């Protein structure tokens, strides 16, 4: 409900067509991250106390990444308080939600020079590990790839239980792990 509320606020701000900076007219991703942070703070101010009274902790985070013409691709993690951090060469990715199961795979395998296809495969293996280890995480998954300087989605795949590529990766990963221990 918190993330949906923040997304609705962001959409309302775009539709209002005021001079205010929105996701649609932000000059860079830093300013876009400020827009998302502002929406989260507004949701917190409006709903946090009511949620607390129901025993629910106000906890929401977003990952915002992409490229605006004239700047390099950037990646931000935006926290529930509306503050945010930007990815660096030392921390080139972010995960939100249940990350403890799949994170070690990404930490050991990824490198900045890795082709997008390999990075996508690593992300899917990471998600498979999380799905296998936590009943609250499951399919379907959405995999979206945006290439540098293309300014559009180059690939969008909905991954469900029937996706043959995902099944093949799961099987190969499991076989490789079993082989190491035999």
Language model regions located:
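A generic local secondary-structure boundary/capping motif
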Residues: 48-54, 63-65, 73-75, 131-134
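A short linear-motif detector with a strong N-terminal bias
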Residues: 39-44, 54-58, 65, 121-124
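Conserved short S/T/G-enriched processing/targeting/catalytic segments and their helical context
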Residues: 1-49, 96-103, 107, 111-114, ...
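Glycine-rich, flexible loop segments associated with nucleotide phosphate handling
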Residues: 27, 31, 56-61
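Short beta-strand segments
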Residues: 1, 57, 61-67, 79
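A two-mode feature
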Residues: 59, 72-182
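Short, glycine-/Ser/Thr-/acidic-enriched flexible segments
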Residues: 2-4, 69, 150-151
């Amino acid at each position: 409900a918190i993330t949906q509320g923040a997304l609705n606020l962001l959409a309302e701000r775009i539709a209002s067509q005021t001079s205010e900076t929105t996701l649609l007219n932000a000059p860079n991703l830093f300013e876009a991250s400020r827009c998302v942070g502002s929406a989260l703070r507004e949701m917190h101010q409006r709903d946090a106390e009511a949620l607390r009274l129901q025993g629910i902790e106000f906890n929401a985070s977003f990952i915002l990444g992409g490229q605006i013409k004239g700047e390099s691709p950037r990646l931000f993690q935006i926290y529930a308080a509306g503050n945010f951090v930007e990815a660096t060469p030392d921390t080139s990715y972010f995960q939100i939600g249940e990350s403890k199961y799949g994170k070690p795979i990404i930490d050991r395998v990824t490198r900045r020079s890795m082709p997008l296809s390999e990075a996508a495969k690593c992300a899917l293996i990471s998600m498979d590990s999380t799905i296998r280890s936590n009943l609250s995480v499951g399919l379907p998954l959405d995999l979206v790839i945006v290439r540098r300087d293309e300014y559009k989605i180059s690939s969008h795949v909905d991954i469900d239980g029937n996706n043959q590529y995902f099944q093949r990766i799961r099987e190969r990963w499991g076989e490789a792990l079993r082989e190491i221990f035999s």
